[in-house]
Amino acid sequence: MQEVSVIIPNYNGMAYLEGVLSSLEQQEFQNFETILVDNGSSDGSVAFTMGNYPWVHIIELPDNFGFSRAVNEGIYAARAPYVLLLNNDTEVKEDFVEEM
């Protein structure tokens, strides 16, 4: 079981996803899951993530229900006892998850 669930709400943020997901991919601590909650994006965010980061669990909402709903959906799906919330335009250092 993962120790940490990282939740990333997203709406039309494909331009930012490479930064946040690549920085998570480089984490020294590996016992975490990543959940991208997509708020009905029309910019290819979901396809980009599926094609480049197959380890990311994606929750697709049919419309833009807003930040709070996306966060809540991610928390409901989280399988770890600890949750980290990241904006889609965040890039983290390689020890971020471990230090948290």
Model-derived segments and spans:
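Short, acidic, metal-binding catalytic loop of nucleotide-sugar glycosyltransferases
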Residues: 22-31
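Glycine-rich, basic loop-to-helix element that forms the pyrophosphate-binding segment
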Residues: 61-78, 88
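Acidic donor-binding/catalytic loop of UDP-sugar-dependent glycosyltransferases
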Residues: 44, 90-100
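Cell-envelope/extracellular polymer assembly enzymes that use nucleotide-activated donors
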Residues: 2-5, 33
